[in-house]
């Protein structure tokens, strides 16, 4: 079998990581794997893992170059001659739609998010099979596009059970990290994700203030990069921290490397997103490391968290409810690794994706 995945870019992100992981697993199974993208930080990993990265602009929304790019993509697809084209985003889906007109290769799309409703987004439903990363996404596209039930398969994102394994903790990294940020004997409440308004870090910070009344040694750890256009938002968060006298209780770590070790050193992980997450990869990864997760009560995370067992939900913007759940999280004991292994493994994602391909 020969598979082509098409994605706008290969920079760091949940969708991109999923493409890299599938490429690696395809190769292990003897499948010829190709990834077409405009490139990025992760493009070399495709080739290192035994796949084939083809650099081509499937990212730009410029309609004036679209015709030229459709012709170029058609030539690439004819040369590769794949059994399946798997599109991961709307621009690639439109380019593939026109490039594939005379090639008639079977197309699979994965809907990764709650995209704006309209003609532009409807392209994802034109594929021969549609994969949704959560039941929330499935309900969303069925509501807005009336997509046929037998065309849709829900396949949650797969978690790398070797990387996110509580038995594979890097004690040296954790010891050095705790020493650098003075986290020894602290109750660490982490939140992972780019610093943007959608992550609602204001609510996270206010909840730390409330939790501090009962947990004096609490520390909020915000982990994620900051784009240049979000610098003002970061400044506003730092002003809020100063205003609430939390400068010794909130830490920013602007890198997403060694994220599995960040989960390992945390006591609880928070997802305070204002916008529903399509799946909630960070939630599943945290639980896999046996860490409770508290998340806003919407989106794909509702498929992952079992309330009062491995985490809790709170309403968007409710810092008091979040703080109360932080306190309650101290009593939770569970086998998160076993739960994720059974329900959200990379193997499960791979096997079910291949099943979709073979049924076309």
Task: Describe every region a protein language model picked out.
Residues 77, 255-256, 262-266, 281:
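Short alpha-helical donor nucleotide-sugar binding micro-motif in glycosyltransferases
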Residues 87-93, 111:
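Short His-centered aromatic/hydrophobic patch
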